[in-house]
Amino acid sequence: MRPAGRSANQVRPVTLTRNYTKHAEGSVLVEFGDTKVLCTASIDEGVPRFLKGQGQGWITAEYGMLPRSTHTRNAREAAKGKQGGRTMEIQRLIARALRAAVDLKALGEFTITLDCDVLQADGGTRTASITGACVALADALNKLVAAGKLKTNPMKGMVAAVSVGIVNGEAICDLEYIEDSAAETDMNVVMTEDGRIIEVQGTAEGEPFTHEELLTLLALARGGIESIITTQKAALEN
C-alpha cells in the first residue's frame, strides 16, 4: 500500500494556479500533492550573444529551493557563494524540456526566463517545475501575441514530466519523498503531449533494472503525463 493509498499508476492531485504573482508575464503555483513550486516566466527583448542575428529566440531556466522547503533547513546557495551540481542539472533540464515546446524561430529575438522556486518539497520537484513552467510559458507567449509582438503563437504543444520508480519490487508513478528515498530504481521522464520523449533520467539505486522493467516504467510515465497534460490544458482554459 502506498502512503496516500494511491494505485501504482496514479499521480498525486495536481493543481495549477495561474496568475499567482503580479509582475511576471506568466506565473503559476504548481502543486503535486504536498510538493509546491512557484514558476514564473519573464520576457526580455534580445537573445544571448551566441544567438544574435540568427532570428530566433531562447528559453532558459533557473531553479532553487527555499531553505525550509525540506524537512531540515538547507542554507541558501547564495549564502554559499555558488550553485550546487544538483541545482545546475535541474535548471538545465527544465530549460531543455521547455525549449522542446516552442518553435524558437517563430519566437523571434526574445528570451524567456523560467524561474522555478520550490516552496515545499515532497518528491518530484523537478517534474513539478517542468509542468508548472510550461503553463507559465504558455501564458507569457499568449501575452506576446496579444501585445502584437508576435504574429503567431510559437507554442508547439504542452510538455509535462513525472517521476516513476521501483519501490519494494513494484513499479509506481509520481513518487512522494518517502517512496523516492526507498526506491530501488528512480526515473524522471519528460514528454510532449503526443507522447514523444524529451528526456529520461533513470538510475538503479540498488538492483539494476531489466529492459522489461524500463518499458513498464515508461508506460507508467506516459499514462501519468497524459493525465497531467489534461490538467494543464484545463488550467489554461480557465
From Swiss-Prot:
Keywords: Nucleotidyltransferase, RNA-binding, rRNA processing, Transferase, tRNA processing, tRNA-binding. Its EC number is 2.7.7.56. It catalyses: tRNA(n+1) + phosphate = tRNA(n) + a ribonucleoside 5'-diphosphate. GO terms for biological process: rRNA catabolic process; rRNA processing; tRNA processing. The keyword rRNA processing applies. InterPro entries: ExoRNase_PH_dom1, ExoRNase_PH_dom2, ExoRNase_PH_dom2_sf, PNPase/RNase_PH_dom_sf, Ribosomal_Su5_D2-typ_SF, RNase_PH, RNase_PH_bac-type, RNase_PH_CS. GO terms for molecular function: 3'-5'-RNA exonuclease activity; tRNA binding; tRNA nucleotidyltransferase activity. It holds the Pfam family RNase_PH_C. PROSITE patterns: RIBONUCLEASE_PH (PS01277). Phosphate binds at residues 86, 124-126. It is an enzyme of class 2 (transferase). Belongs to the RNase PH family. NCBIfam families: RNasePH. Phosphorolytic 3'-5' exoribonuclease that plays an important role in tRNA 3'-end maturation. Removes nucleotide residues following the 3'-CCA terminus of tRNAs; can also add nucleotides to the ends of RNA molecules by using nucleoside diphosphates as substrates, but this may not be physiologically important. Probably plays a role in initiation of 16S rRNA degradation (leading to ribosome degradation) during starvation. This is Ribonuclease PH.
